[in-house]
């Protein structure tokens, strides 16, 4: 009787230990996407890396999903662009159904740089924001221009929506394919109401500024000399950053 009780107790202890170890491994595997300003970085825990085109970096979140950014350019400043379309939103949701192609006066630009909008504390911590270097217009987040994207292959320009983007779409007219259209900041020179967008095939075409079915795939500049906390820079295991450098 005592032997049976002892065996049962040992089995229970082993089961608890295996469960604890398994949960620890799961948490460790996902840690590279769940970082914030509360992370403590020791002198030997972070490392310097030379970022290259197509490296992936996790900064912030949207609709509860971590945002993975792709390195687009590494010249004077490191340009990042969202790996996926984060939401569908009109460039200028005008009542006339047409709108204006003026990006600098657009509600979309204002939303991208507003704490009540895209830069909500729910999406970006103070640490996340410290990693961003504003562009020449003082914007932390912006839509990529056609010129920024013209040297990227059509295949690499294509973007698919995030899972939460699809779940939160309110348009009953939207038929989602693998890839979707998304905005650039570039107006169509011959039409004050049309904006250049990237299509499902990765090409450029125009759409009305009031189009609510066009996606938002934002861009940002990364501050210089950042340190990497963990990750390998791939889509599956993006870099998590530890700060450093100048904005």
Q: Language-model segments: which ranges?
A:
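Hydrophobic alpha-helical membrane-insertion segments, chiefly the h-region
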Residues: 14-24
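Intrinsic N-terminal pre-sequences and regulatory tails
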Residues: 4-5, 22, 30
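N-terminal Sec-pathway targeting helices
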Residues: 1-12
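Collagenous Gly-X-Y triple-helix signature in extracellular proteins
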Residues: 27-247
């Amino acid at each position: 009787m005592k032997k049976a009780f002892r065996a049962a107790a040992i089995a229970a202890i082993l089961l608890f230990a295996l469960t604890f170890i398994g949960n620890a491994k799961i948490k460790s595997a996902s840690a590279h996407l769940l970082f914030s300003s509360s992370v403590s970085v020791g002198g030997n825990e972070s490392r310097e890396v030379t970022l290259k085109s197509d490296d992936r970096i996790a900064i912030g979140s949207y609709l509860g999903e971590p945002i993975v950014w792709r390195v687009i350019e590494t010249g004077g400043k490191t340009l990042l662009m969202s790996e996926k379309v984060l939401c569908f939103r009109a460039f200028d949701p005008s009542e006339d159904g047409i709108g204006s192609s003026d990006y600098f006066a657009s509600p979309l630009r204002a939303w991208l740089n507003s704490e009540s909008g895209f830069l909500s504390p729910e999406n970006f911590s103070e640490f996340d924001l410290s990693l961003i270097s504003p562009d020449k217009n003082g914007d932390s987040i912006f839509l990529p221009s056609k010129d920024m994207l013209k040297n990227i292959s059509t295949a690499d320009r294509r973007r698919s929506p995030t899972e939460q983007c699809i779940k939160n779409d309110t348009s009953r007219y939207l038929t989602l394919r693998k890839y979707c259209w998304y905005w650039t900041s570039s107006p169509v020179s011959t039409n004050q109401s049309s904006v250049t967008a990237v299509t499902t095939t990765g090409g450029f075409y125009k759409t009305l500024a009031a189009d609510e079915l066009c996606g938002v795939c934002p861009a940002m500049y990364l501050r210089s000399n950042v340190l990497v906390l963990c990750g390998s820079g791939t889509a599956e295991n993006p870099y998590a950053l530890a700060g450093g450098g100048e904005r």
